[in-house]
Amino acid sequence: MGGEVLNNEGMPLAELKQETIPISRSESSESLNSLTSTRSSSSNRPKTYFCDYDGCDKAFTRPSILTEHQLSVHQGLRAFQCDKCAKSFVKKSHLERHLYTHSDTKPFQCSYCGKGVTTRQQLKRHEVTHTKSFICPEEGCNLRFYKHPQLRAHILSVHLHKLTCPHCNKSFQRPYRLRNHISKHHDPEVENPYQCTFAGCCKEFRIWSQLQSHIKNDHPKLKCPICSKPCVGENGLQMHMIIHDDSLVTKNWKCHICPDMSFSRKHDLLTHYGSIHTEEDIPLELKYKISDIQQLVQDHGVQLGNSKHSNEQDEEKISNRLRKRRKLTENNNVEFLQNEVDLEKRLESGENGLNLLLNTVGRKYRCFYNNCSRTFKTKEKYEKHIDKHKVHELKLKILQEKEENKTLVDQNHKEPFIIQKETQSAGDK
């Protein structure tokens, strides 16, 4: 089939909207009767006043209405403007009605629930929802509905059987659902965008959920021989194995106590400090944001690394001031887990693992730092990545300065002892 949807009788489904379905309304309640008083009385006067603008065949019963039409429609004149917004209106009554939208005043209240609305039309539409005034006209069916579309859908699906799929006899309650069903499952012109990526499997599917059901039932997950993590397909397993290859991972997070220990993630370094060393050994730049440390140094005159005693005091000051803004290390673990879950979802969606691994299409921004081959599609993400490198360099610089200051302090402690010893030797002579 093409794009046109037919019912069981061969009639285009789009024409169902044009069909006239006999509808009977229940007798109005007192509230609905009151609505009739809000309707403007219709005039029986003939429309003898015609608009003389080219291409306009409008006619009106009064000259004042004709003048109003010409000023508003053809001349664009709207004399009544709202002082709270930029809207303007032809009639003063329209402006007064609009002003209710800027206030809490609701002049029309529902007699059933007391809800307030701003116009009579809104009150009419609201009060009708309290009564099932639309009655099914079929014999033996006394169902009532609040709204006309509900009644129409009931008649089409239950009594006329015009919302049944001609291919699989599946019934639907709404015409658009039948159209979507036929388009997804029975239209030969619609391609199958979801393909199975398992080796030797060439099956294609129209919807993503069908592909997921196929993978779950027909292709078991492959487990990693190192960590036993289940992976989707051979591509997913190959991509996962990269994290176990140390030669492909850049390790920029180094322990300042253990010279041979370096890690690829900050979280792993913090875990190392927690398991091997004490919390006091963790550098400040790992526990807090480097920007917060710089701000405290600038605002409060904290000096880092002048002496061992002052260094401990200043670090304690910084720790106390930053404790409330401290980033818990667990956040890094949560972020990593979210990335793992996102990666697994993308693999399960049928994306090729090689494309995920070498996704360089349209990535024109390449990181210029050594041992970093990251590429980006947008300048914003590229600059954000470069900022991370700069922050890391600043952290390394702070560590280096602390080590140099510590060396100078140790030398200053030794020099007085050497001078005193030389003086004593000279006195003995």
Curated annotation (Swiss-Prot):
Keywords: DNA-binding, Metal-binding, Nucleus, Repeat, RNA-binding, Transcription, Transcription regulation, Zinc, Zinc-finger. Its main location: nucleus. Transmembrane segments: none annotated. It comes from the Eukaryota. Residues 24-44 have a biased composition (Low complexity). One of its GO terms (biological process) is 5S class rRNA transcription by RNA polymerase III. It is found in: Nucleus. PROSITE patterns: ZINC_FINGER_C2H2_1, ZINC_FINGER_C2H2_2. InterPro entries: Zinc_finger_trans_reg (IPR051061), Znf_C2H2_sf (IPR036236), Znf_C2H2_type (IPR013087). Residues 1-45, 406-429 are annotated as: Disordered. Gene3D superfamilies: Classic Zinc Finger (3.30.160.60). The keyword Protein biosynthesis does not apply. The keyword rRNA-binding does not apply. Coiled coil: none annotated. Pfam families: zf-C2H2 (PF00096), zf-C2H2_4 (PF13894). Present with 1380 molecules/cell in log phase SD medium. Interacts with the internal control region (ICR) of approximately 50 bases within the 5S RNA genes, is required for correct transcription of these genes by RNA polymerase III. Also binds the transcribed 5S RNA's. This is Transcription factor IIIA. It comes from Saccharomyces cerevisiae (strain ATCC 204508 / S288c). The gene is PZF1.
